[in-house]
UniProtKB/Swiss-Prot annotation:
SUPFAM superfamilies: Cytochrome P450. Glycans are attached at residues 249, 317. The gene is bsc7. The chain crosses the membrane at residues 12-32. This is Fusicoccadiene 8-ol C-16 hydroxylase. GO terms for cellular component: membrane. Gene3D superfamilies: Cytochrome P450 (1.10.630.10). Its EC number is 1.-.-.-. Signal peptide: none annotated. CDD domains: CYP60B-like. Belongs to the cytochrome P450 family. It comes from Alternaria brassicicola (Dark leaf spot agent).
Amino acid sequence: MASILWTTSLKVLLALIVWIGTTIIYNIYFHPLHSFPGPVLARATRLYSAYIRAVGLSERKSLQWHNQYGGIVRIAPDELSFNTGSAWNDIYGTKSRKSQRLQKDPHFYMGATAPNGEKNMGAVGDEDHSRIRSVLAHAFTDTALHAQESLIRAHVDRLVQRLQDLHGKPTDIVRWMHHHSYDVIAHLCFGQDLDALGSKDWFPPARVVFEGIREGVTLIEVLRFVPFKATVLDILVQAFGKARRENFNASVARAMLRLRLAETTSIDFISYILRVKESAKELTRSELTANVALLIDAGSETTATMLSGCLFYLSLNRTTLEELTHKLREDFRTHDQLSLQNLAKMKLLTYVIQESLRIYPPLPATLPRLTPATGAMINGVLIPPKTRVGMNAFAAYHSTQNFADADMFIPQRWDNTNDRFARDQRHVHRPFSLGSRGCLGKNLAWAEIRLTLACLLWNFDVILEPGQEEWHGKQLTWFIWNKDPLYMRFAPRTK
């Protein structure tokens, strides 16, 4: 009996070894993507890319690989990474024929289902996405933004006041920016002021946002190798997703309270949604809550990251910081003059924000797509069907093929009259993506960043604490940046 068991086990082991070896040989030499360059381990097995992503090294490795292999890199047996400007349009741009469209990778977005079972706008198919986006878009028009300016400004003023109360003591600006951005987006969504800034420690809902994204990305990579993925995901979410469910349920309660008011003259997002009366477009309550939760998660995390990165790189580059601070205080004699209309005309402020979005993109990772059954022409190359493809933002923005002195913070590169950067591939820079699934809140993000940054520099002398110089350089990524505390001082302005 023991002999039979031993023989059977040996046969199974040998069969497994043969299967693994055959798969590796096929992936390297015979797979439809075999001709594309990339690391041998990545071409041989998806385990390598899954490991790289799970430990937070994906973006650093992508940059290294693109520098080594060029504009197209095979980062897994069935996946290609791009870092060129033309690839943006080829992958994410709008296609006239449905059969030519690259769809979102269903595995990557399988976790984009809210606890109520509803998929948010980021994960639904094209038709539902178009319907939901057309409804939400009413809350993001220029007219809506003009009406929302006073609300954003009130939150910025409160941030300034709270920082003034510190009297120049060192503080973790990452936490402040997360609380500030969460207050703004939550107030815009629900018409309620949650005052996360008033929390002495991390405001739990704000922390859940980026912790949930980080843990979710790791889980999705692990699930690539597990059968019955959807069932396993549901079990794990039920077992370990308590904080996420509580956060979502709180959002549902606030949304339901706001809906009961049924008032459409406010400036919050729900008021604009309620004005859409076309029955074919109206959102169900479960769709509304799932997408409001998405707006809060996406809006608070990315804006907080943008502001943290911008303040960090400005404080590292004192000449630019002093120039921008002087310009703000010279052009605007009173705090009340810092309006969106006035700030939009300030070129240096715009250049600083653009450069911050390049060197420290709030979403540094790849948004994966699948090529259609007919394949797809990307970067002038025919890519086989059912291939995972995507632009890696960090690798694209830090490539010396795209930007001169790519690792240096130089806002002047965005000045069209600067010959030094005339060969920069500026069309590569798409921090809000593009096409029909590009960021809906782009203008709102710009408005919040402009107002917040301008008011902080107008009111304070910003100083980076010693020992914080490598804050960005040592960060890992799990789709978003894993931000350590960033200690800075906001001293009352001296002139």
